[in-house]
Amino acid sequence: MKLCGGIDLHSNNSVVALLDEQDRVVYRQRLANDAPRVLEALAPYREGIVGLVVESTYNWYWLVDALMDAGYRVHLANTAAIVQYSGLKYSDDDSDARWLAKLLRLGLLPEGYIYPKEQRAVRDLLRRRSRLVQQHTANVLAVQNLLARNRGQSLNANAVKRLTPEAVARLLPNPNLALAVQSTLLAMRGQEAAIELLEREALAQVRGRAPYRHLLSVSGIGPVLGLTILLETGPVERFGQVGQYASYSRCVGSAHLSNGKRKGHGNTKSGNKYLAWAYVEAANFAVRYNPTIKRYYQRKRAKTNGIVAIKTVAHKLARACYWMLREGTEFAVNRAFA
């Protein structure tokens, strides 16, 4: 008897459901989020299980890793692409788990990519760095806003980063205001050290790879953007076509058209936000420093606007990087922006 399993994963528990080939429930149980307990519950049905579906929630790593290490065939459900019948009168965790298992049995499951565990940890270093950069920027803005409120004028970001306790005391004679700025500066110093540490460690593990060196040949891509693109892309072979990669990088439109008219738009958040950021950043740098790309950008901007033109350049760079990673070649600006 072949069994398909669905696991509705939550923060502290999971609902496991196993269905046979006639969609009959063979096993259903709510289990604590404990890998040995989940494996123990599945053990009696191991020989019949042909696949297990896990929701791609924020905490799926531990469960997918444990199931794969135990030899199960695991599928990661792309929850953003799974749509249940909107007229359902009632649904709960049990029905969600059964629905995942049924989609797998029917071959209709929208799947997410399970990034290899070893490489995933390096990629997450870059994601942590990105979060720290955002927090650091928020602290810079907080200092600028405080100075503007209390002095009528502010400082640029570089001047804020160079502030010393003595300079803060001169700018803000009020000790409470000075302490507020100094405490923010202390947090910024810690963030800067952590950002440098994460970047250095990720670079040490990736620097020797040929695909990384090829990415650095692209106009606008430096060490951080190269790391981000390489690690967020993963094995480029998982994208069957260049258009799929461009879509995953959020570099394509999402308009719904009918009879030449716009009827709405699709899911603009579908894809990888880190790749989307990296390619837009690379596009801005490329336009600034590469004459060929700058001319292309100016032609597009004359027909549309700056935002659309930059996104078009980002799309071109994403397509170029796809072929570079796939073929192991370096960047050729005349091919990408002919």
Which stretches of residues belong to each language-model region?
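Gly/Thr-rich phosphate-binding beta-strand-loop-beta motif of the actin/hexokinase/Hsp70
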Residues: M1-D20, L100, L132
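Short glycine-rich, Thr/Ser-proximal phosphate-binding strand/loop in the N-terminal lobe
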Residues: N12-P36
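Short, basic/hydrophobic alpha-helical segments
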Residues: A35-G51
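Acidic beta-strand-to-loop metal/phosphate-binding motif
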Residues: I49-S56, L100
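Short alpha-helix plus adjacent loop in nuclease-associated cores
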Residues: H75-R127, R131, E166-A169, K261-S270, ...
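Glycine-rich, often acidic, oxyanion-interacting loops/wings at catalytic, nucleic-acid
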Residues: L126-H214
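Phosphate-backbone recognition surface of nucleic-acid-processing proteins
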Residues: H214-S217, P223, T228-I307
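Low-complexity, acidic/Ser/Thr- and charged residue-rich accessory regions of DNA metabolism proteins
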Residues: G260-K261, Y297-A338
